[in-house]
Swiss-Prot record:
Regions of compositional bias (Polar residues) in chain numbering: 592-617, 1159-1175
Organism expressing this protein natively: Danio rerio
Function: Required for the intracellular transport of organelles and vesicles, and is essential for the photoreceptor's outer segments formation, maintenance and function.
UniProt cross-references to PROSITE patterns, sorted A to Z: EF_HAND_1, EF_HAND_2
Gene that encodes it: Ninl
Family matches, as SUPFAM superfamilies: EF-hand (SSF47473)
Record carries keyword Heme: no
Stretches of the chain forming a coiled coil according to its record: 464-590, 660-791, 821-876, 919-1146, 1202-1278
Keywords (A to Z) from UniProt: Calcium, Coiled coil, Cytoplasm, Cytoskeleton, Metal-binding, Microtubule, Phosphoprotein, Repeat
Principal localisation: cytoplasm
Domain of life of the organism encoding this protein: Eukaryota
Protein name: Ninein-like protein
Amino acid sequence: MDEDEQNRYVAQLKDEFDSCDTTGTGYLDKEELTALCHKLSLDAHLPLLLDTLLGPQHYARVNFEEFKEGFVAVLSRSLDFSTSEEESSYLEPAVPEEVKPKYVKGTKRYGRRSRPDKTDLELTADSDSLPFGTDKVEANGVRRAKLRRSTSLESVESLKSDEDTGSNKESTHHYFVAQGQLKLWNQDGTGNCQRSSDNQQEVTDGQVRAVWEELGVGAAGSLNREELSLVCDHIGLKHLEAEELDALFRKLDKDQDGKVSLIEFQSGLFKPHDHASPLSTSTPARPKPLRTISKALEERVVRSTSPSLLSATVGQRLLTRLDDGSGCTSPEKVMALWTEEGIHNSRDILQTQTLDFSLEERLCLAELTLALDNELLVSGNGIHQAALVSYKNEINYLQVLADQACQERDKAKADLEQADRRNLQLVREVDDRHATMESLNESKIKDLEQEFRDKLTALRSESEYESEVLLEQVEKERERLRDELQLLRSQDISLQEDMCTTVNENRRLEEEVSALKEKLTEAESAISKLQNDLDRLLQDKYDGLDANGTGLLNQEEQFTEIFKEYEQQCRELQDRNDELCSELELLKSQGSGKRTRLSRSSLPANDWSNRRALTTESDSDDPEMKKGTSPQVRKKLQVTDKNVLGSLESLAPPVSIETELAMEKMKERYEQEVQDLKIQLETKVNFYERSMDLMRQNMEVERKDISQSFKMEISELEDLKARAEERAEQMRQTTERLEAELRGKTSGGAWGQEQERRIQRERAELEQNYAREISNLVLRLTSEKDQLEAELKLRMDREVLLVRAQLDEVTSENCALKDRLAVLQQDVKSLEEDVNNKRKKLEEMEKGYMKNREDEERLRKENSKCREEVLDLSARNLQLSSENAELSSRLCTDQRAVQTLTDRLAQVCQERDAAAVSSKQLQENLQQQENHGLRLQEQWRKEKELLERELQTAKEALQHLTVVESALTSQTLKNKSLEQDKESLLKETAENDQKLKKLQEALRNSETQIEQLNAQILTMWQEKDVHVQEAAAHIKMLQQSQDKVQELEERISQLRKEKEQVQHTHRLQEETAVSVLQNECKSLRVQNKELQNKVAQLQSRELELQRLTHECLTLRNKQAELETAKQEANQQAMRAESTRSMVQAQHTREIQELKEQMGSGTQEHASHLQTQLAEQQRRTQDFEDLLRSQAKQASVQMGLQQEQYEKLMASMQERMDEVEAKLKNTRVMLQEKVNQLKEQLAKNSKSDVLLKDLYVENSQLMKALQVTEQRQKSAEKKSFLLEEKVIALNKLLRKIAPASLTA
């Protein structure tokens, strides 16, 4: 290790020392030293280090140099005692033990002379024990000579550098694997990984890019999640779960952009970490690098006791791979090997005198090795070539075996260290996770308890408040129902009185109808009498006339037939009237029966009305709406109510207080809704019954009107009869007058043929006129009759259609109500099912929560057990590692003993005769040693199997821990999902409540609409009744209505004019407001432009100010440069002065020397010196002049620059003052503009308010206009109806008048 690396390591140690120096004095006390040792993982050597540094003085303090010396001393001592022989086992070659041959024949020796080489399994088993050192020392104190480590800090740190240089031989892929595993298992930085040295090989960008290009990922310079999984699989992080991969991706993605860049990947996976070394050893337990073959050969040459080339290079024999286990091989194999390597006379070589090996017997490899060794030492012929080829082959083979053994040993060490790190890290992670889970669960439980308490208090307060509100509402409703009951009773009494009056009126009307019938029969009999009289009179009058009289008689017969037909029609109409009267009586009897039933059922109806909670004002104001419902409806409602309440009461017992309160609320709400539905159904049934009663009443009224019209028709017919009688009387008088005239004319004899013709003409004209009038009467009566019948049919059809339509509406509404009730019942059932499901879910959630608690407790216990097992396993691993280290040390001692025995065996070979007995003893000792070694190997193998089984159990425990952790995570996810389900259920209940509220609102809206429609129908019926009752009065009020219509038209015209005026004024106001706003907008735009210009000016001024400040800064920089130049000039002047003084001193010194020389020198030398002195004086003078001129120039330049700088500063100050004044002015102007804008905004707000007021007034006027238009439309409709009624009355009058005229 060079000096730079040593200084760097000392600096690192100094940084750690300073980090523990809390006082900052450079000294550490006992507590700070313990903290530093804990950081350096020297807890095992802490007492020795404290005793070395502090001694008996516990309150002493130590500086860094003292700590460094004590640290090196303690570390070297620990290296002497605790470093096991595994270092020498891989630093030194394993020399095979030589055994005494079993049979000796002359110069030839047969049998094994060395131990069989260990198999690969044994090599790996030996390597497993290498990382664990032992502190035990052999009791006899016999220790083999080994390479000791240096006790200095340089040697300790050089070990790290050697290891690092050895690790550089690994490939990039293996480096990736190691780094990835280290990153995976040491994410918290507390594993057992050693501190990375500074010269560790870092992964470059090129290597990472090469891996990415090999996999075909990271084309855009970043990785997504799938590409990261591919890279992790490639570099050795295989079998990662999805959660671990997500955690690694989130950790690498530092900027949270969803991708991992190259820098993030390299810094996240391959950055160096400082980790504490394991507690079992004080030296870094890193995998030992492979030594080079040259170094191993050198050490073997150094350590070998045999002077031969064979023992120095490859051991005591060659061609080991041809050995079949007995130390011998067939000569054919050796010859085949030599012939393969190019030696063709292998048979001759084996049969030479020097080697003298038989081709029929088996060839001993040890003897061949010794023979070849001797030949190499003696001669240099072809035998040497065979020996060299054999050496080369053996060396290559041994190199391969050594490399494999070292690799397997390093791999086993790394696996053991990694398993220890994983165990410790898993224990820590499990502890941390359990602690975090416990804290999270406790915090969640506390939060849930607090939430439940808050909700419980809120629900209690809400329930108390709602109960108080309900009590108040019940009291108010009770008072209101009492008032309604009193009203109903009073209305019942008034209705009974009205019924009595209507019954009396009906009787009176029946009596009048019977009287009118009698009068009608009398009139008919009088008409028949008058008709007979008229027939007789006409027959008597016109008997004496000529044959033309027969035509008159025929016409009279026709007239009589027509009258008979009319009489028949009158009888039919009378029959029709009788039928209508009978139907009217039936309807009256049905109405009286209904009233008696209603009066009987008034008591239970009143009881039922006491339970009504929510009724509309229209129902309470209308007395007909207070009647009770039918018993069937009541029974159905009671049955559904009982079923629903029973279903609600039969629910499962409450699970928690919150669910109980929610269930009570839902139950109360449901009862209230059912009660509302019952009340609504009652009101609708009452309304429809009342509407049926009103229809019946209307029918009675219409029938009364019809009877009245018939009475009027009868009176009109009576008038017609009277008129006919008067006309008959007039005709009788005219006939009598005519007869008298005829008699007078006939008696006077003055009548001639002309008078008879004139009489005949007059008679013919009279007959024609009479016939024409009769035909006109007949036609008019038939038309009026047809019209009356058609009107009656139309009216009856309309009434029947109306009744049917109303019945259809009632039935459809009843069906709709039934469907609605069924839908509501289904909704109630669905709500009950939802409540049951929610309750079941809540129970399941609570069961799952309890189960989770139990699982958590069980997992805690299992984790504690696993933790204890892991600790036991780690302790067992440490114990077994120490035992393995002890066994390895014993093996090393045995190998050293074997080495000594081989040395002694070589001496015995030189002294054959004297060493026979000693060779036998050595053979026995070797056999014992072999047996002991075999026993040790067997014991070590068993312990290794035990360790492997324990490792397997530890792995299974770790797998179980991972399964437990996954179960915990799944359980937490289940808890989260259950909480989400709970929240979703609560949301669903809230949504269901909102849906119920919406349904209730829709029901209320529909009820209000139905009530409005019913009110409209009632008003229409009332209006119809009023119009029917006031039909007679409307004829008189027609003129008034026309006047009113004219007034309304005038008023409408005035309103239209006012509307036009208002619209005109509104338009004018809008136009003025728009013009004002446009002007303001224009002014604001102009002001905005001005402000923009000013802002641009300000920006330009700011730019100019920035430029000036920049110039000022440049001037200041120039001034600073000038000052530095001035200082430099002054320094130069000072230097010049100093040089001048030095030159003068030197000059004086030279003059003194010259004077001294002149005293002893010659004249020539003096003259020469004088010339030199003159030249020197001239040079000094020139130099002084030059310095003076430079100083003057510098002073002049400095003055000029100072003057320029002062001028620039003055001009800059002036410009700054001007800019500040301009800025002040602009600020004042901007403030004024801001104030103006504020005033303008206030004006705009006022104008907006005025506009809103105008819009409001306009809307009000529009509403008033709409109301007036509606009133006008309704008045026009009423006037149109009145006109129609007047026209109908006029038609009736026209029909009735001709009949009276004909009569």
